[in-house]
């Protein structure tokens, strides 16, 4: 058995990635979220596949096909809610995973970090298109508002929007292509995950100290397989509590009304995991400026390795940077709250202040404080 595991061409890859992989001996539970994201992706692909067997991508029957899944298909309700709430768990793990990378300086592994940013954009695109598929009010108007943002692009904007819509409004053609993309993208994500892991295993994992752990490595199995299993059980517990007790907690009641192009919902808003970016978009009165701010709010992650001015990799022993990190976290919570509020006083002002703080923290305050901490090392 030992020989098969180490010599068989396929088994050897698995062995070197998940069994005999040398891992740092001191990585904490914050490193669990990578494997949890893998579990979330597997859950989404499996539940999505079963939903696709019963779903029809047509404007006249899409809404009723989702209702049919919940009412008539064996365990259809649990498959649907696992898929919807599984997306929320996916993003929760994703945000913590990115936060961990920022806190402990994992962004210094630039190839892994950049593939991660591409993954984030791909997952966000997939989730957005998935939200359109039930063809409820928020699905339709969310699709209309977000795709319409592309019309802010000079010269080609309006043509681009009509090209994406496949007509002069969000209609049957849009729904069909969104379903096609929503089906294929998770498999592209799975391929990107393998590239992400490939680059990670080239350098080895970071650790809480941010130091080299080459002198002290332990095998991934059994130590971290058991540790990841505990994290997985807790994730399953949280997901099942959500699915079985309050499946619609994170959804929007408007999406239980079939899409109606003649009636606009009072407050158009995306799912909770996009609210922070939506708040940044809304905080700028100019359309093109808002779109640029929206894209930059995510793309800013790509320049974080360049903005890293500290002599220490991790924030573990940098209390001033820690204060700024948790301020950034609080700021993102505020932006998420603002994104779900109507566009009126005082929410507009709070959103603008939180948006300015978000960019100021990342671009100016964090690099400056890191330089101050470098000076403090000499005291």
Curated annotation (Swiss-Prot):
Binding-site residues, heme b b562: 83, 182
CDD domains, sorted: cytochrome_b_C, Cytochrome_b_N
One record GO biological process: mitochondrial electron transport, ubiquinol to cytochrome c
Residues annotated as transmembrane: 33-53, 77-98, 113-133, 178-198, 226-246, 288-308, 320-340, 347-367
Annotated keywords: Electron transport, Heme, Iron, Membrane, Metal-binding, Mitochondrion, Mitochondrion inner membrane, Respiratory chain, Transmembrane, Transmembrane helix, Transport, Ubiquinone
Protein purpose: Component of the ubiquinol-cytochrome c reductase complex (complex III or cytochrome b-c1 complex) that is part of the mitochondrial respiratory chain. The b-c1 complex mediates electron transfer from ubiquinol to cytochrome c. Contributes to the generation of a proton gradient across the mitochondrial membrane that is then used for ATP synthesis.
Entry protein name: Cytochrome b
Organism listed in the record: Eulemur fulvus collaris
Lineage: Eukaryota, Metazoa, Chordata, Craniata, Vertebrata
Protein encoded by which gene: MT-CYB
């Amino acid at each position: 058995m030992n020989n098969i595991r180490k010599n068989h061409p396929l088994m050897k890859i698995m062995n070197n990635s998940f069994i005999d992989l040398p891992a740092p001996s001191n990585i904490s539970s914050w490193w669990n979220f990578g494997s949890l994201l893998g579990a979330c992706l597997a859950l989404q692909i499996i539940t999505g596949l079963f939903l696709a067997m019963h779903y029809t991508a047509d404007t006249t029957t899409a809404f009723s096909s989702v209702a049919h899944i919940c009412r008539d298909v064996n365990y259809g309700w649990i498959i649907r809610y696992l898929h919807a709430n599984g997306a929320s768990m996916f993003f929760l793990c994703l945000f913590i995973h990115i936060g961990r990378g920022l806190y402990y300086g994992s962004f210094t592994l630039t190839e892994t970090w950049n593939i991660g940013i591409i993954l984030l954009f791909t997952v966000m695109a997939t989730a957005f298109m998935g939200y359109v598929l039930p063809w409820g009010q928020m699905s339709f108007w969310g699709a209309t508002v977000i795709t319409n943002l592309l019309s802010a692009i000079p010269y080609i904007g309006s043509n681009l929007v009509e090209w994406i819509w496949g007509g002069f409004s969000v209609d049957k053609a849009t729904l069909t292509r969104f379903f096609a993309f929503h089906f294929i993208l998770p498999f592209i994500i799975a391929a990107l995950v393998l590239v992400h892991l490939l680059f990670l295993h080239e350098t080895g994992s970071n650790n809480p100290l941010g130091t080299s752990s080459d002198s002290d490595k332990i095998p991934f199995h059994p130590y971290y397989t058991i540790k990841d299993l505990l994290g997985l059980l807790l994730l399953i517990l949280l997901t099942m509590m959500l699915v079985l007790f309050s499946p619609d907690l994170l959804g929007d009641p408007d999406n239980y009304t079939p899409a109606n192009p003649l009636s606009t919902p009072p407050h158009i808003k995306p799912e909770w995991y996009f609210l922070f970016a939506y708040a940044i978009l809304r905080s700028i009165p100019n359309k093109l400026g808002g779109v640029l701010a929206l894209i930059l709010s995510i793309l800013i992650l790509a320049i974080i390795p360049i903005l890293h001015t500290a002599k220490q990799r991790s924030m573990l022993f940098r209390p001033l940077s820690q204060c700024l990190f948790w301020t950034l976290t609080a700021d993102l919570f505020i932006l998420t709250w603002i994104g779900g509020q109507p566009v009126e006083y005082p929410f507009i002002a709070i959103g603008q202040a939180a948006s300015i703080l978000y960019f100021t923290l990342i671009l100016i305050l964090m690099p400056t404080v890191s330089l101050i901490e470098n000076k403090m090392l000499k005291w």
